[in-house]
């Protein structure tokens, strides 16, 4: 978001004159599931989700530092991403207050887990806490078997 008080795009420090041909977000495996990491701003762009689908990622971790009462938008965006990609999404949002120069920001928390079916499985409200969930490889496989989004894209040469 390119606001005078919060230019999130500048945090990525990519020269605007340089074309970026490839992305390579972090991916690692644990317990038979591939995990990807997608920072808050990146979650808005299809290219990251396409990459995770190509790599057969089963859970995307989305660390954020969101403010401006944007929680409803984040919930809808990440529920849709989880469902259309048949994977878990775990959003960890900063909570608390911070001052940057003359500006003060209130980070509202509201971390949550979304299932491959697009449902909120567990969440924290506007409070500090520990959020636990089980990432179930069988649930990922069941969602992929039911909707077949990835399979249909691959069969059409689109992925």
Language model features with spans:
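Residue-level detector of flexible, active-site-proximal loop/helix-junction positions
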Residues: 2, 96, 128, 137-139
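Amphipathic alpha-helical interaction segments
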Residues: 14, 57, 115, 155-157
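Active-site beta-strand termini and strand-to-loop segments that position acidic
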Residues: 28-31, 116, 135
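Active-site catalytic loop in hydrolytic enzyme cores
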Residues: 1-55, 68-76, 80, 145-148
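A conserved C-terminal secondary-structure "cap"
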Residues: 140-159
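CN hydrolase (nitrilase-like) catalytic-core segments centered on the catalytic cysteine
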Residues: 43-131
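A broad, structure-centric signal for solvent-exposed, well-ordered loop/edge residues
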Residues: 5-10, 120-121, 128-131, 142
